[in-house]
């Protein structure tokens, strides 16, 4: 049995609101295996973004355990959590968050150089990913010169630049029109499968969810099979 790329065990997350406590996650259990693409669905306000933030080590759970590639994350220092994020995780958000003054290729080079990769191999990796996304002719364009779909495809390339083991995506096509969303989502699936990653992708779109390997629903603070 392969080591899960991501495992949550009885994860809870509560927030204080004055004298009241808001329980967003109430014992979430989830495993995502290497090479598996899992859709995370649920109504607005169910806590999908909170769950992804915890999976990405950007928030700490109130209780429970998060394991990334078999590594228990609860007692890690902030420096160690940062390294684990850098080396094991990739993130795609609803908005692309590209650096406007840099070209498409440079946006993909930056996280690699932060990780200690030299500029030449970083540029080669950027060119490889952009080619897979059908953007070779756009690699020298800045974000403002790209369409919304192209910007999001560059953001996906950036997320995969450091060859993560796990991709986390929060409504990655939510800002796009239906036709563009379809093209971007298919490109995302093709690239994730080609790279052999595990992925947890939050979406409100049931048609997109059904194209993934498995669907889980966040309901009343727990993760249940769809």
UniProtKB/Swiss-Prot annotation:
PROSITE patterns: ABC_TRANSPORTER_1, ABC_TRANSPORTER_2, LOLD. This is Lipoprotein-releasing system ATP-binding protein LolD 1. ATP binds at residues 42-49. It is a peripheral membrane protein. Its main location: membrane. Its EC number is 7.6.2.-. One of its GO terms (cellular component) is plasma membrane. It comes from the Bacteria. Residues 6-226 form the ABC transporter domain. Transmembrane segments: none annotated. It is found in: Cell inner membrane. Part of the ABC transporter complex LolCDE involved in the translocation of mature outer membrane-directed lipoproteins, from the inner membrane to the periplasmic chaperone, LolA. Responsible for the formation of the LolA-lipoprotein complex in an ATP-dependent manner. Keywords: ATP-binding, Cell inner membrane, Cell membrane, Membrane, Nucleotide-binding, Translocase, Transport. Belongs to the ABC transporter superfamily. Lipoprotein translocase (TC 3.A.1.125) family. It comes from Rhodospirillum rubrum (strain ATCC 11170 / ATH 1.1.1 / DSM 467 / LMG 4362 / NCIMB 8255 / S1). One of its GO terms (molecular function) is ATP hydrolysis activity. The gene is lolD1. GO terms for biological process: lipoprotein localization to outer membrane; protein localization to outer membrane. The complex is composed of two ATP-binding proteins (LolD) and two transmembrane proteins (LolC and LolE). SUPFAM superfamilies: P-loop containing nucleoside triphosphate hydrolases (SSF52540). It is an enzyme of class 7 (translocase). The lineage of its organism: Bacteria, Pseudomonadati, Pseudomonadota, Alphaproteobacteria, Rhodospirillales.
């Amino acid at each position: 049995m392969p080591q899960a790329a991501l495992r949550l065990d009885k994860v809870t997350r509560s927030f204080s609101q004055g004298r009241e406590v808001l329980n967003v996650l109430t014992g979430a259990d989830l495993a995502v295996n290497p090479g598996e693409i899992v859709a995370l669905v649920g109504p607005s306000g169910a806590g999908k973004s909170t769950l992804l933030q915890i999976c990405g080590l950007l928030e700490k759970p109130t209780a429970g355990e998060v394991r990334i590639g078999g590594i228990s994350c609860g007692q890690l220092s902030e420096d160690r959590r940062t390294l684990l994020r850098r080396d094991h995780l990739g993130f795609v958000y609803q908005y692309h968050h590209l650096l406007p003054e840099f070209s498409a290729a440079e946006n993909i080079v930056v996280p690699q150089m932060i990780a200690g990769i030299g500029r030449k191999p970083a540029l080669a990796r950027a060119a490889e990913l952009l080619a897979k996304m059908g953007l070779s002719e756009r690699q020298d364009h800045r974000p403002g010169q790209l369409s919304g779909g192209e910007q999001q495809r560059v953001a996906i390339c950036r997320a995969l630049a450091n060859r993560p083991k796990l991709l986390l995506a929060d409504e990655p096509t939510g800002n796009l029109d239906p036709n563009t969303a379809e093209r971007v989502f298919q490109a995302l699936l093709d690239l994730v499968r080609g790279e052999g990653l595990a992925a947890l992708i939050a979406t409100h779109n049931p048609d997109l969810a059904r194209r993934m390997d498995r669907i889980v629903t966040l309901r009343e603070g727990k993760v249940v099979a769809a």
